Structure formats: C-alpha cells, structure tokens
C-alpha cells in the first residue's frame, strides 16, 4: 500500500488496555508495510507509541478548537504546510500529548496547549505525518461531537461544570 490514514478516537493512549495494546501492535505492523501514514490525533498518539516514544495526559486539553497553532521553522520547510498561514486555528478534541519525539522526529508546529501539534518521522522506510488537531472535521461536526460527549465532559473529564458551560 502507498498509505494509511489513522484517525481519531475517544481512547487515551496512556490507558493500558488490551484494545489499545492491539492498536499499537497493529500500527507497528503498518509502520513496516506502507510508504506513508497520516496519523491524526489518536493516530499520532498510536504512531509515536508504536515507535517507542513517550506520551502523556496533557495538562490541559482542546475541546472544539486548537487556537493559534504556530508552524515552526521546520514546518515552514515541510510539504505538509506548503502555502499555509504561519498561525492558524483548527478543530481539535484531545486530552493526550507527545512528550518525546521518535528518533529523528521533527516537530512542525505547536501551540500553548501542546508543544507538539504536528510532527514528522520515518521508521522502517515509512514516512509518518502526525497531527494533533483535526483538519478533516468541520467546526459543525465538532459541535455535534461535543454535544454527543457532553455527559462524559461534565461528569468524568470535568472540563465543564454543567450543560450551560457547553453552550
């Protein structure tokens, strides 16, 4: 195959469950089989973990929008950001973050919430392009995801006090 796109999930990479371990092993396999992997949010967490590097629960989170993502010098020279504004906002929904890049990994962009908003690394002849945010999701869809997850966001995550905080 030429490529694989690995999208988001409501799972958290730092939870050590059989389902998560299976996904990490699955990613390790694909990191040997394809030329390119676009790893979005959860996909980036799985790709970095499969490459043997650290991630953790973020100190804060993105709920709806990742603001002021800033492309760094490495990112400006990377094809992922060709023609993109240096600072931008994007739909985002995450509680995890990469704390150590894979070997020869390059951070391409960051913001106040996540030092690694995007990255690039190669492993086993596979090029991995990782994004912590969700360019594939519209803002309208993000609003519906927040609505769908509101009980969890209030009762478990405690990022909102009540439903009025969400509106």
Give the positions of each predicted feature.
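Cysteine-nucleophile active-site neighborhood
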Residues: 11-75
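Glycine-rich, N-terminal phosphate-binding loop of Rossmann-like dinucleotide-binding domains
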Residues: 8
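Amide-donor transfer/coupling interface in amidating biosynthetic enzymes
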Residues: 71-167
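Short, Asp-centered acidic motifs that coordinate Mg2+ and/or phosphate
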Residues: 3
